[in-house]
UniProtKB/Swiss-Prot annotation:
Residues 1-26 form the signal peptide. The keyword Transport applies. Binds 1 Ca(2+) ion per monomer. This is Cytochrome c-552. It comes from Escherichia coli O9:H4 (strain HS). GO terms for cellular component: outer membrane-bounded periplasmic space. One of its GO terms (molecular function) is calcium ion binding.
Length: 478
């Protein structure tokens, strides 16, 4: 059992921000002044917040791209028919937010503002320019249209104005002035009984992270961002909500199942875990207080692994040494990964077996209960694995979700075996070779050579035009 202590250093780290910011709490929770334009250029705030700015800039050191599809080609099959089957990399530093959404194969290779596969909403977690545009055009104006429309406007990487009321006098004096810069996030927090302006400072610290590190979907004709929390934040609650409104992100091209794609539900999984339940915030673990060269405390904005700052993070509460805690976390991660792979194997078979049933003439009515099981199994699997830190945030909940996903996938396959038998198919359905990402993509009919060539042309021709236009309009520093 993990032992927890509340030592003097932990108390000191918690009390400093409390006493430091109590005097400005009322101003900090006030809404940004409507008459002041959101400033999206992060370097503008370096003079007032030099340590925070330089540590934020250091997220550019987190530059490695890890290809999740190459590590686990099963994902290609599970996301067949969806852009994630083309390209899915693990997350890296905030300094790459705009670059990565521009360069991923998922956003396509649009030639003009009305072209491309994805909506404007795909910019929503990438840049303080989003807050600027929402303030300028309203939410309807911002969300309207295709992703490419935002190219010349959304050019600054995730930064200051995403989490701080940078227009406030207190921010100019060096205070943090936290805010929810996305109105849809504020509405979601209110829906779960957490209005931002009434929340305590520690709650607010995690809520600003929860604007983006969260599950969401694109709602209505305008494809506006909405969090599916109306019925609650657990996986079953969100599943019920999506089913009730008959929402699907896409239809799997093999099984023809209307699917749900989880995003990055760190806020939900953190809330369900031991740290969230004890109000140990995102900031405590990922952005600890550290000292600069003069000995002044500041919040480290090089967001990263808590083990990289062990003395300022884990050691504030835990008595175990770093190696002991790393061993615990590694074991939890391995347990979750082992069950994850088992669920994926079941789902891969279910998608191909469903395709075989459809090819054999199965009707919509015959397929409906099977597709429901596939949909629910993959949703629960996805919500567990899309939160990359679930082995740390909520390992028990991760295993529980994966366990229910396994049950649902097994139910689907049992029903498929019976249905296939009625169609005269009693042999095992053959699965093509999907041992590599490339073979899996070929199995679902993707022309990756063409997709990559089109993307490279887009990167070479369209992105430079966007940046040139942004500089002319004063949106990027020269």
């Amino acid at each position: 059992m993990t032992r927890i202590k509340i030592n003097a250093r932990r108390i000191f780290s918690l009390l400093i921000p409390f006493f430091f910011f109590t005097s400005v709490h009322a101003e900090q929770t006030a809404a940004p002044a409507k008459t002041v334009t959101v400033e999206a250029k992060n370097e503008t705030f370096a003079p007032q917040h030099p340590d925070q700015y330089l540590s934020w800039k250091a997220t550019s050191e987190q530059s490695e791209r890890v290809d999740a599809l190459a590590e686990d080609p099963r994902l290609v099959i599970l996301w067949a028919g969806y852009p994630f089957s083309r390209d899915y990399n693990k997350p890296r530093g905030h300094a790459f937010a705009v670059t990565d959404v521009r360069e991923t194969l998922r956003t396509g290779a649009p030639k003009n503002a009305e072209d491309g596969p994805l909506p404007m909403a795909c910019w929503s977690c990438k840049s303080p320019d989003v807050a600027r545009l929402i303030q300028k055009d309203g939410e309807d104006g911002y969300f309207h249209g295709k992703w490419a429309r935002g190219g010349p406007e959304i050019v600054n990487n995730l930064g200051c104005a995403d989490c701080h009321n940078t227009a406030s006098p207190e921010f100019a004096k060096g205070k943090p002035e936290l805010t929810l810069s996305r109105p849809y996030a504020a509405r979601a927090m209110e829906a779960i009984g957490k209005p931002f302006e009434k929340a305590g400072r520690f709650d607010q610290q995690s809520m600003v992270c929860g604007q983006c590190h969260v599950e969401y979907y694109f709602d209505g004709k305008n494809k506006a961002v909405k969090f599916p929390w109306d019925d609650g934040m657990k996986v079953e609650n969100m599943e019920q909500y999506y089913d009730k409104i008959a929402f699907s992100d896409w239809t799997n091209s093999l099984s023809k199942t209307p699917m749900l794609k989880a995003q990055h539900p760190e806020y939900e999984t953190w809330t369900a875990g031991i740290h969230g339940k004890n109000n140990v915030t995102c900031i405590d673990c990922h952005m600890p207080k550290v000292q600069n060269a003069e000995g002044k405390l500041y919040t480290d904005h090089k967001i990263g692994n808590p083990f990289d700052n062990f003395a300022q993070t884990c050691a504030n509460c835990h008595t175990q040494d770093k190696a002991a805690l790393q061993k615990v976390v590694a074991e939890r991660k391995q347990s979750i990964n082992d069950l994850k792979i088992k669920v994926e194997d079941q789902l891969v078979h279910a998608h191909f077996e469903a395709k075989a049933a459809l090819d054999a003439g199965a009707t919509e009515a015959e397929m409906k209960p099977i597709q429901d099981d596939i949909r629910h199994a993959q949703w629960r699997w996805d919500l567990a694995i899309a939160s990359h830190g679930i082995h740390m945030h909520a390992p028990e909940e991760g295993l529980r979700m994966l366990g229910t996903a396994m049950d649902k996938a097994a139910d689907a396959r049992t029903k498929l075996a019976r249905l296939l038998a009625t169609k005269g198919i009693t042999h095992e359905i053959e699965i093509p070779d999907i041992s590599t990402k490339e073979k899996a993509q070929q199995a679902i009919g993707l022309n990756m050579e063409q997709i990559k060539a089109e993307k490279q042309d887009f990167i070479k021709t369209v992105i430079p035009q966007w940046e040139e236009q942004a500089r002319k309009n004063g949106l990027l520093s020269q």
